[in-house]
Structures are given as structure tokens and as C-alpha cells.
Amino acid sequence: MEKQIGILTAGGDCPGLNAAIRGIGKTAVSHGMQVIGFKDGFRGLMENRYVRLDNGHLSGILAQGGTLLGTSRDKPHKMLLGGNTVDMTNVIAENYHSHHLDVLVCLGGGGTAKNAYKLHQKGLNVITLPKTIDNDIFGTDVSFGFDTALHIAVEAIDRLHSTAHSHHRIIVVEIMGHRAGWLALGAGVAGGADAILIPEIPYDINVVAESILSRSRRGKRFSIVAIAEGAVSKEFAEKRNTLENELDKEKEKAKRNRLKRELKDLEVQHAGNTLKLSQELEKLTGLESRLTILGHLQRGGTPSAADRLLATRLGTACVDSIREGIFGVMIAARGDHSKPVPLDKVVNKLKLVPSDHPWVLSARDLGTSFGD
């Protein structure tokens, strides 16, 4: 009997999703399997909106950005319906079985892996592929989407150098990365940023300002500051760590809820932090400062050759796992090879930048400030 494969893309879009869909689909079809694509993530599976994917659908999509299936951030166990949040896991399981699926392949980041793992615990066969421009998925060397976003961020820094130099300005460039700084770090090093601020290394703004003034005294009348959106000051990091530690220790529900609210309020206070940092640097240095937020530019456009290669090989390796009956795994990139990693080793973890990572050490050797 032909195997039936379901595919969906969930979470934020990024370059390489279509390449991965193509890699899975064409390989599966070549082995006589049927492929169903569910539209708009887990919501499409819940609403039973789908398209049968054949070579006609999969032709010509390798170089396209985005995802032909559409995506959403809906969670099976927390689906927004009519203004209410409803657990639709059972409906999703029913639709899975109604299509006689042998496996559901979920392309997404850490949140998608977590949602897929919950479905696996309910008895569904699932496989995930690591997709995120943040490159923060635990268990894989790299995620597709990262390389393309890195190229976009580096090109932006290259372009900003000329205007910063011409006007003798500080230019602060906000780069995506909420809890991990891989993208800002890579772009900062490759783009020659003078300061790089990432979530893993809390900064002191006075140290950043002094590094800029030191450049100015040496005749360098401009500076580029590459900052991850989730970079925080030492003061903020201390407050957050205190609350998180208290939450971990607290058993009483009411107190836990209070601590969760305090953490949420603290994160709200952090919104707009990059603009505040840019303004504060202007005050501390006396140099004109401008902020550029790259935002969703980093998610769009044609995937790089590296992302096409990565997404394709992870897609074909996914079908190998399906044929071997290996489920409940993420297909990880390990060097030049692919490896199925159990989802329980992946979920609720982040791949963070270690303080001794070669990119960090090289940047420090070059005199780049991390604000610490």
C-alpha cells in the first residue's frame, strides 16, 4: 500500500521552505508515495484545507522564497476560534487519520518542533525539519533560512557603512534574534560592525559609548552597532534572571502567576529598547545616531545556494527516515550529513552563542566591542 505523507509549514516564513517541500515531495513521489500539503500550518490541518502535491506543484519552486503552502503560528492545543482559545488536538488527530497518513512532516522552528512533539505523544507519527533565520534550534548545526538572512543583513551593513562614514554618524542596525544572537553576531563580524550586542552577552551602554568615543579619538568619526532584537543590558538581564529563578523555585500557583505577569511586564518594558539605546548613545557620545531596523527584510526573497542545498538534503533525508519507519525525530544537519534526532532531545531547548565561539573570539581580537 502506498505511503501517505502530510506536509505543513508553521511559524514564521523564511527562504528555503519551498526547497525543503520540493526535496521531500519529489523524493517521496519517486518512491511511489502520495503527498498532501496542508495549508497555513496546523490551522489548515485542523480545518482540513489541503492540496495533493505532485511533480507539477513541485516544479519551479526551488528558487522561490516563502512557502507555497502558507503558514501560521497556530498551535494545535491553543487554537483561536471565535475569540476563544480551544484545544483542537483531537480534531487534528481525526483529520490525520482520515487521510490515512503514515507521517506528518512539520517544517518549522522550535515552537513547531514542540507542537509536533505534543502530537507525537498523542500517537501521531511526526518528523520535523529545522527552519529559522535565528539559527537557534537545538540539536542541528544549522537551520535553513539562516544563511540567506545572514547575507541580507551583511549587505545592509555594507550599505550603511557608506552613509555612516559620510555623515560621521553612529548607525545602530537591529537584526532579528530574540533569545539567540547568531544572526547579529555573524552579520556583525562579516559586515565589520564596531560593536555587536547579542542576548547571550548583556551589555553596559557606557562601555559601548566609550568604545565609540575611543574610535572617534583615533579619527574614526563613525561607528556601526549591530544589535540583536533581544539584546539586553546587564541591569535588565539581572532583573529577568532573578524573576526566572524565583519562578523555577515557586510551587504556589498564585505566586507563580504573579511572577509570570512580572516577567511579561518586564518584556513589555523592553519593547523599543533599540531605539532607546540609539538615543542614549547619542547623548553619551555627542555623535548623531540613527537606527535602522531590518525586520522582515531578513525573511524574504530568494534562498541562497547554501540554503537550497541544506533544505534539499534535509528534505531527501526526511524521506529516508520515513522509509525506515523512524518517527518522532527532527532531521538535523551534522557536518555534511543528516541525522534523525529524537524530538524529546530538541524541544524546550535553545542553541545559544557560547562565549568562546570562534566568531566571538575573532571579533574580540579585532577590537569589536560587545559592551561587556
Residue ranges and their predicted role:
Residues 1-9, 20-100, 111, 227, ...:
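A cross-family phosphate/adenosyl-ligand binding-site feature
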Residues 8-17, 176, 307:
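Short, glycine-rich nucleotide/cofactor-binding loops
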Residues 8-9, 38-39, 70, 106-108, ...:
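Short beta-strand segments
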Residues 20-24, 110-124, 184:
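Short Gly/Thr/Asp-enriched flexible loops that form oxyanion-binding sites at enzyme active sites
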Residues 32, 38-39, 119-143, 150, ...:
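Short, acidic/small-residue loops that bind anionic groups at enzyme active sites
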Residues 95, 103-108, 116-118, 146-164, ...:
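Accessory alpha-helical/coil subdomains and C-terminal extensions
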Residues 161, 216, 319-326:
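Short, hydrophobic alpha-helical segments
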